């Protein structure tokens, strides 16, 4: 039976802990296909992906975000990449798991596991992220009084960090949550919306596990012209 692993957001304040690890990997970028609902502003999608990049970059990993609407030329020019077949959907609706709440938490993103293996699709909920930001007014202030740009920056932080967590489940091929760092099951509003990313650090063991799994993969796509 499929198991849904989701990142729960807790509406609580906390101090930032942990340290960002130095980059150690020399692997090619990982290609991820992205699609977004028409209701999600393109500028927000761009910022979400930039935030996810910023979480993973200090650990030595990078991504090539391939949009379904990208021209073929752009895909060719991307260069050699690891292509594990991961797809991210940024949806404006509430999928079956999207409204799940437990002990003052809300699911922002999720990935399914079947027989211990991660599915190839991650769902990120735009609606839930907006609702969570409104619920976090004790941390971010009143959303309806914010300039649009400020609201988008805050949404990009929470959504980008949630996406980074779900990508972690995929790259680690594990449902396991940790006591600290990126793979914690729950993060507080202070961690999600704060400027610092220290609460989303990737530790040395996780870096090594992801690098080893990617190196074992034979799905290396040379996305350039063969001459």
Where are these regions (language model features)?
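Generic detector of intrinsically disordered, low-complexity, polar/charged segments
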Residues: 12-15, 88, 106, 178
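Residues at or immediately flanking beta-strands
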Residues: 31, 60-64, 182
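Metalloprotease/metallohydrolase-associated module, dominated by Zn2+-dependent proteases
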Residues: 23-24, 33-49, 113-158, 170-227
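Generic structural signal for short, solvent-exposed loop/turn connectors between secondary structure elements
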Residues: 21-30, 66-84, 173-179
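Metzincin-family zinc-dependent endopeptidase catalytic domain
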Residues: 42-167
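Residue-level marker of intrinsically disordered, low-complexity segments enriched
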Residues: 1-2, 9, 74, 88, ...
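Residue-level marker of positions within ordered structural domains that often coincide
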Residues: 6-8, 57, 173, 188
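Bacterial Sec-dependent signal peptides at the C-terminal "C-region" and cleavage site
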Residues: 3-28
């Amino acid at each position: 039976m499929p198991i849904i692993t989701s990142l729960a957001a807790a509406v609580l304040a906390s101090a930032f802990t942990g340290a960002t690890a130095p980059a150690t990997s020399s692997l090619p970028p990982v290609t991820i296909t992205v699609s977004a609902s028409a209701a999600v502003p393109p500028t927000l999608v761009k910022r979400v992906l930039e935030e996810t990049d910023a979480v993973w970059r200090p650990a030595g990993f990078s991504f090539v975000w391939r949009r379904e609407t990208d021209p073929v030329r752009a895909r060719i020019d991307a260069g050699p990449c690891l292509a594990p077949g991961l797809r991210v959907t940024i949806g404006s609706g509430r999928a079956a798991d999207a409204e799940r709440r437990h002990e003052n938490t809300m699911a922002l993103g999720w990935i399914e596991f079947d027989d211990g293996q991660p599915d190839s699709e991650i769902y990120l909920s735009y609606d839930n992220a907006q609702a969570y930001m409104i619920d976090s007014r004790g941390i971010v202030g009143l959303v309806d009084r914010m300039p649009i740009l400020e609201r988008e920056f805050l949404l990009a932080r929470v959504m980008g960090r949630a996406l980074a967590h779900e990508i972690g489940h995929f790259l680690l091929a594990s449902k396991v949550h940790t006591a600290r760092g990126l793979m914690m099951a729950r993060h507080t509003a202070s961690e999600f919306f704060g400027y610092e990313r220290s609460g989303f650090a990737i530790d040395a063991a996780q870096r090594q596990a992801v690098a080893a799994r990617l190196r074992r993969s034979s799905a290396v796509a040379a996305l350039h012209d063969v001459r």
